[in-house]
């Protein structure tokens, strides 16, 4: 075989020209221990706290413990097939989730991956899961109401856009029901809703999604689900992921409502992770930074200043108590972080008062500024009258003779309690709430039998819709009860009452 020197030269020249000098440096480490969803990695000298680490089998982990000689990572997937000695790589990114309009109407997991079988989420935008909360200058005060459609809450414990209002109570007292009704009441109000399920049963989440779909609420709702079968790190990430999805819309100038259901299970997931990472336990075996865990999440809810678009993120965190004990660690922490709490009692629930709101210890610390004037006018004395009724009711059980004034108060109180009862999935427009509460507070219902109150309420709305349609419009337009409007309301209620009483 005859090879010419020129050919050899041209081949060598060609190879030199095509030689690629790109050198890629990969910061890698070695797994020295793995188990219980926790991996200890040797190496990764320049690793960041909260950084994504790439493990074999397309599994990612999150670096949480940066120690002197190793890095403690939590796995965001199955540890199957991963063993000691495997090489892991840094990604130089922190955990982020997809955000955008494409998520609305979808059910996703803590990492923003769809789990509803409707195909991929078509969005290119992402946002870090952990973002600093807006500063004092970037916020404005809460001044616009977020109507829940629940009479007891909108009147006595009003919620404003940008507020954090805790829903707290024992299991099976209707905490999720209040959050669901609030989501349903946002229909047609241009509010994006996000429901974050943390550590719930899959059947419960499926039931909630089914109900939201049936009521047409999935058109403006995102469900972030991290069920009981998910690992602790995924349950830990879920609320932060949901919050990032909400912040995207908030920075676009929109109003967002986010429900965290529930933060007790979130704290348990964080406790599991912390103990496995060998962090020292504190009270109730929770780590020392469990307060910061929830404060940095809830502080991200805000009403942004007009300069930043004026969007808002309203949070309804849910916390479960054991036997009504609000002095436990997590309940006291979250109560001190939020701007008020709605306390639900199992005794009231079992007595048939639903929603089972205890008006005595439930408060809204900033929502009063957001209430419309008409609601303030009718609800001003409501809390006091209910408190007096409870005191009198307890006193009257001893069978003592009561004077006329006390009997009158008792009868009025019974009717107020009856008016505040409301079935699930039936949120009420604010103008109707004002009409019926006005009727109750102004002694119009005193001669209606207690067992006929619900029937009276339903038929009164039908009567006003037919004969006095402009009353509702006037309330919404003026946002206050003028003397003229009051006399019109009195006339409408009295006209209907005469018809109603004649038919009983």
Curated annotation (Swiss-Prot):
Keyword hit for Cell membrane: yes
Query: What reaction is this protein's catalytic activity?
Result: ATP + H2O + 4 H(+)(in) = ADP + phosphate + 5 H(+)(out)
Uppermost EC category: translocase
Keywords annotated in UniProt: ATP synthesis, ATP-binding, Cell membrane, CF(1), Hydrogen ion transport, Ion transport, Membrane, Nucleotide-binding, Translocase, Transport
Tell me which GO cellular component terms the UniProt record holds.
plasma membrane; proton-transporting ATP synthase complex
Q: Name one GO biological process term.
A: proton motive force-driven ATP synthesis
Q: Where is this site: Required for activity?
A: 362
Topology relative to the lipid bilayer, per the entry, is: Peripheral membrane protein
Specify the domain of life of the species encoding this protein.
Bacteria
EC number(s) reported in the record? 7.1.2.2
Please list the GO terms describing molecular function: ADP binding; ATP binding; proton-transporting ATP synthase activity, rotational mechanism
Compartments annotated for it: namely: Cell membrane
Residues annotated to bind ATP: 169-176
Q: Which InterPro entries match?
A: ATP_synth_asu-like_sf, ATP_synth_asu_C, ATP_synth_asu_C_sf, ATP_synth_F1_a_nt-bd_dom, ATP_synth_F1_asu, ATPase_a/bsu_AS, ATPase_F1/V1/A1_a/bsu_N, ATPase_F1/V1/A1_a/bsu_N_sf
* Role of this protein: Produces ATP from ADP in the presence of a proton gradient across the membrane. The alpha chain is a regulatory subunit.
Quaternary structure note: F-type ATPases have 2 components, CF(1) - the catalytic core - and CF(0) - the membrane proton channel. CF(1) has five subunits: alpha(3), beta(3), gamma(1), delta(1), epsilon(1). CF(0) has three main subunits: a(1), b(2) and c(9-12). The alpha and beta chains form an alternating ring which encloses part of the gamma chain. CF(1) is attached to CF(0) by a central stalk formed by the gamma and epsilon chains, while a peripheral stalk is formed by the delta and b chains.
Q: Which NCBIfam families match?
A: atpA, PRK13343.1
Q: Which family does it belong to?
A: Belongs to the ATPase alpha/beta chains family.
Name by which UniProt lists this protein: ATP synthase subunit alpha
The species this protein belongs to is Clostridium botulinum (strain Hall / ATCC 3502 / NCTC 13319 / Type A)
